[in-house]
Amino acid sequence: MKKLTEKITQFIENFKNVHAEARKIGFAGIMNLLWKDLFVGRSLFQWLYLIVLSSVPLILEFTQNTESHDWMSLFASWTGIVCVILVAEGRASNYLFGAINSAIYLVLAMNATFYGEVLTTVYFFVMQPIGLYAWLSNRINDQGKAEESHFEAKKLSVLDWLKYLALTAIIWIGMGLAYQSIHSVRPFRDSVTDATNGVGQLLMTRLYREQWIFWIATNLFSIYLWWGENIHIQGMYWVYTLNSLVGWYQWTKAVRKEA
């Protein structure tokens, strides 16, 4: 109970700090921070990486021999790719693109009757402001290190690994049983991404490097899930997989730098 009280007190204090900082710099200051987070401090290679990968949805759309364009899927794919690249770079602006992507992807998943993806996307949408708060709180409350890095990556201990793997199994089985109760055709298949996405988002919010392992698992399974359904979403998850490998590498370097 004492630890819970301390965490609640810390949450309230951090929220006050974030709110006070936002009021101090004003709307113009917030926009300036957003601009810097999006565009400042990126190397030439990172710019090329961002431009090339975010062009994949456009290439897929305009090289297909179709009479009409699937603009919703294209925009969902584009915002998703930009989001995960910003995550790999440790930029808080990823949550803006994540919120937009989640809203569009929710509609696509509902249309495809992928109920597991629907629930996961609702969870993602809710987690975006929470994640943004966590990242901003981390920066504001430790401003001495803010100039050195966009974020302070951490790594899981053996005990943490066991805890999060157990949580993954619980979510997978629990959601599988829930889908089974509503007569889903493939209940435990649908619940796979609920588990990997849910734990991955938790690790991302807490700035753990191992989030990328869960993202890789999610991406590979999602490619299988969307195979033959939507070329844009397939392409998005292939890019996600590549970016997850890059993200693992970048966050591993950040962990070693903080050690």
Residue map of PLM features:
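Hydrophobic/aromatic-rich structural module bridging two neighboring secondary-structure elements via a short loop
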Residues: 92-134
